[in-house]
């Protein structure tokens, strides 16, 4: 029986059971049936809790998460398996916060949905006999009792079974499997006859903190926590099992598990073709700002007023001309659109009172640039369903594009520091829970590291542009509204600053569905000459619009000022996510917190202060062809933030697919590095799944190139 228990239950449950028996002075070598009973009860308690969460609306939902969702709260608190002191602390805390009556005995779970403690029973006898024993022992109407048997029967207080049928079926199936496994080994009769009453356990070994989170995050789909996965793996006989299962599914399928060795993986194949192009909704490292310090003009804070004030700071305007035409567009129309913006801004300035918003005249150039009347006419399906050759028009396959170094330069630039402060200390927001000293200290340290970062500028720029565009799309659906691209920051000395990057003209925006597209023309200032990397600017028509005096080491030099113009589009759902780009700050802060937690658990004290203030220590940042790149903790913060920001700026189905599929290969490689002797089948299929996501997206191609660097160094 002891061997069976060690095979059948995951090691953590076995260890907890061993501790409990030791505490009660019982020898598991002799009391083997009791050992099995304790393990079974523990596992049922864990399964009862698995996958059940409470969402933000307070509703109970079932999620089988591939990634733990930070916004969801676990429906059940597990009390069973904790050490006695901790278990009573949890019970007292629950009673204090919910007003629940304190139970006389330690219960197994607490249900936050129904606000009640739950006692779980697992019996080899009749469920009603066992239920009565439990009820007599507890003598409390407030504690809910739920009994399961090995025959698939169950009984619960007032026939209220708490969980949905599927969740209960999972528990019953597991109990039935345990019974069958025991029977096949000739252990069941002895186990069935040995029951003397419910066994409970109040000692528990816990993996906590970062290691627990990393363990729970690194599971295959459909496993909610490491215990379930361990239980599955422990009871798993790989030899022939997978092959057998697959052959049941289809005669054509056969899977041989091949060992995964250092020589097995090959680099991911990046596509050939012309270099990839810039596809972000606004310019990043190439943008240029016209700025005013300490703004105090009339109407300060109204975008149009701010924009006109910023435009007045520049005196080098000249007759615009096209220096890099757009390959397919009517370039004179882009030129005329910019001239129209200048003229209409001029008209505003001559008015007595500047209006709060400006709707552009619907000229032929703007109609063309915004795709007015270009959409094919929609016809009701009923009117044309009888047409014999009715078909959806063919769409071309996207052209393959090769990796280009400009996207690495963009990323490097995003990690750099600027000379402005882009977020205030409270930008990340208060914690939902009462904030502890450590959490607020971490937040302040992190904010100090990233407040000057260019990626943070991109966040604030993205939030502003998306908010303004969504507002205009709803408030002025038929108008070609002029929207200045503005950001606010502070100088090192703390002076306020308003920046103008350029303008957007919005097209018609009757957005009924989340994915309905609004077209816009963006016109952005820059000092970057597009002729240096013409492939990057494939989608743009670039004008030369002025000369700017730049202070340099050798005095003032005149540089041509360019305007990058392109037609673009976005949707309600994309703008909604763009408005929430501040989440990137939170995501990268949580990643840094995981690192601090890991360090703290090793040193057995909070290491926040040392982590941020020990400037001599370096940390791994990422892989490059040269090897593992290292840098200061500030550099790590900024790199993680830049990654999160680029995931938002370059969000796409290609990125989703690449992230999900390459993660599988990453886990296999990590298992190899940890000497876990991983085996794989259909590795070629995994490579195919990864490589079909590498089409033309610059950010995905950069991630694939990083992944290849990682493979090279990980398998040395």
UniProtKB/Swiss-Prot annotation:
Segments carrying motif Nuclear localization signal 1 (NLS1): 124-139
Q: Which family is annotated?
A: Belongs to the influenza viruses PA family.
Metal-binding in keyword set: yes
Q: Which gene encodes it?
A: PA
- The identity of this protein, by name, is Polymerase acidic protein
Cofactor binding note from Swiss-Prot or TrEMBL: Binds 2 manganese ions per subunit.
* Annotated Gene3D superfamilies: Influenza RNA-dependent RNA polymerase subunit PA, endonuclease domain
Which species is this record about?
Influenza A virus (strain A/New Zealand:South Canterbury/35/2000 H1N1)
**PTM info:** Phosphorylated on serines and threonines by host kinases, including human casein kinase II.
Query: Could you tell me the keywords of this UniProt record?
Result: Cap snatching, Endonuclease, Eukaryotic host gene expression shutoff by virus, Eukaryotic host transcription shutoff by virus, Host cytoplasm, Host gene expression shutoff by virus, Host nucleus, Host-virus interaction, Hydrolase, Inhibition of host RNA polymerase II by virus, Manganese, Metal-binding, Nuclease, Phosphoprotein
Cofactor needs: Mn(2+)
- Quaternary structure and partners: Influenza RNA polymerase is composed of three subunits: PB1, PB2 and PA. Interacts (via C-terminus) with PB1 (via N-terminus).
Q: Which residues of the sequence carry a binding annotation for Mn(2+) 1? A: 41, 108, 119-120
Documented EC number(s): 3.1.-.-
Could you tell me what this protein does? Plays an essential role in viral RNA transcription and replication by forming the heterotrimeric polymerase complex together with PB1 and PB2 subunits. The complex transcribes viral mRNAs by using a unique mechanism called cap-snatching. It consists in the hijacking and cleavage of host capped pre-mRNAs. These short capped RNAs are then used as primers for viral mRNAs. The PB2 subunit is responsible for the binding of the 5' cap of cellular pre-mRNAs which are subsequently cleaved after 10-13 nucleotides by the PA subunit that carries the endonuclease activity.
Q: Where does Mn(2+) 2 bind?
A: 80, 108
Instruction: Tell me, in one coarse class, where this protein mainly resides.
Output: host cell
Q: Which GO terms describe its cellular component?
A: host cell cytoplasm; host cell nucleus
What one GO molecular function would you report for this record? Answer: metal ion binding
Its annotated compartments are: Host cytoplasm; Host nucleus
């Amino acid at each position: 029986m002891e061997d069976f228990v060690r095979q059948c239950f995951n090691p953590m449950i076995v260890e907890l059971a061993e501790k409990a028996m030791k505490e009660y002075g019982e020898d598991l070598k002799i009391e083997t049936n009791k050992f099995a009973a304790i393990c079974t009860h523990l596992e049922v308690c864990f399964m009862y809790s698995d996958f059940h969460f409470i969402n933000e609306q307070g509703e109970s939902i079932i999620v089988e998460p591939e990634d733990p969702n930070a916004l969801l709260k676990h429906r059940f608190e597990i009390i069973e398996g904790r050490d006695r002191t901790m278990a009573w602390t949890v019970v007292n805390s629950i009673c204090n916060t919910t007003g629940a009556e304190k139970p006389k005995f330690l219960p197994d779970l607490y249900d936050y949905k129904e606000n009640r403690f739950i006692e779980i029973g697992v019996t080899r006898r009749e469920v009603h006999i066992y239920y009565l024993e439990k009820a007599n022992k507890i003598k409390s109407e407030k504690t809910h009792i739920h009994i399961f048997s090995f025959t698939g029967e169950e009984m619960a207080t007032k026939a209220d079974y708490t969980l949905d049928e599927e969740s209960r079926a999972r528990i019953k199936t597991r109990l039935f499997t345990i019974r069958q496994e025991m029977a096949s080994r000739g252990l069941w009769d002895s186990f069935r006859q040995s029951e003397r009453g419910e066994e409970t356990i109040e000692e528990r070994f816990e993996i906590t903190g970062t290691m627990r989170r990393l363990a729970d995050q690194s599971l295959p789909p459909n496993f909610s926590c490491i215990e379930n996965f361990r239980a599955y793996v422990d009871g798993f006989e790989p030899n022939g099992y997978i092959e057998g299962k697959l052959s049941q599914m289809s005669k054509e399928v056969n899977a041989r598990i091949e060992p995964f060795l250092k020589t097995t993986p090959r680099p991911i194949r990046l596509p050939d073709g012309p270099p990839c192009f810039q596809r972000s909704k606004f310019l990043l490292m190439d943008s240029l700002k016209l700025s005013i310090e300490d703004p105090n003009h009339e109407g300060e804070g109204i975008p149009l007023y701010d924009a006109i004030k910023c435009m007045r700071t520049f005196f080098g305007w000249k007759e615009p001309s096209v220096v890099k035409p757009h390959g397919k567009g009517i370039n004179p129309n882009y030129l005329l659109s910019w001239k129209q913006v200048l003229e209409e801004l001029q008209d505003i300035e001559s008015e007595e009172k500047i209006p709060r918003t400006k709707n552009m005249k619907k000229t032929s150039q703007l109609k063309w640039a915004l795709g007015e009347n270009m959409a094919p006419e929609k016809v009701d399906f009923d009117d044309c369903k009888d047409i014999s050759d009715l078909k959806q028009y063919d769409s071309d396959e996207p052209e393959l594009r090769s990796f280009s170094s400009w996207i690495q330069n963009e990323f490097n630039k995003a990690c750099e520091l600027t000379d402005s402060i882009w977020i205030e200390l409270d930008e990340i927001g208060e914690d939902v829970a009462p904030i502890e000293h450590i959490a607020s200290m971490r937040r302040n340290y992190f904010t100090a590291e990233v407040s000057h970062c260019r990626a943070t500028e991109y966040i604030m720029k993205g939030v502003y542009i998306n908010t303004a565009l969504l507002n205009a799309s709803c408030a002025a659906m038929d108008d070609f509204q002029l929207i200045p691209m503005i950001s606010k920051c502070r100088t090192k000395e703390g002076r306020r600053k308003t920046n103008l990057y350029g303008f957007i003209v919005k097209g018609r925006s009757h957005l009924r569905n989340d994915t309905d597209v609004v077209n816009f023309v963006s016109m952005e200032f820059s000092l970057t000459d597009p002729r240096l990397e013409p492939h990057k600017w494939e989608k743009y028509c670039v004008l030369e619009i002025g000369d700017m005096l730049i202070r340099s080491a050798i005095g003032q030099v005149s540089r041509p000022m360019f305007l990058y113009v392109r037609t673009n589009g976005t949707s309600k759902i994309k703008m909604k996510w763009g408005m929430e780009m501040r989440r990137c700050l939170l995501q990268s802060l949580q990643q840094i917190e995981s690192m601090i937690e890991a360090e703290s658990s090793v040193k057995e004290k909070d290491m926040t202060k040392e982590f941020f203030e020990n400037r001599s220590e370096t940390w791994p940042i990422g892989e490059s062809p040269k090897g593992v790149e290292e840098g200061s903790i500030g550099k790590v913060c900024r790199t993680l933030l830049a990654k999160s920001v680029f995931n938002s700026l370059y969000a796409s189905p290609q990125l989703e697919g690449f992230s999900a599929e390459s993660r599988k290969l990453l886990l296999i490689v990590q298992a190899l590095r940890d000497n876990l002797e991983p085996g794989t089948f259909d590795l070629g299929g995994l490579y195919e799944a990864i490589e079909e996501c590498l089409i033309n997206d610059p950010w995905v191609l950069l991630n694939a190139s990083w992944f290849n660097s990682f493979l090279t160094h990980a398998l040395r």
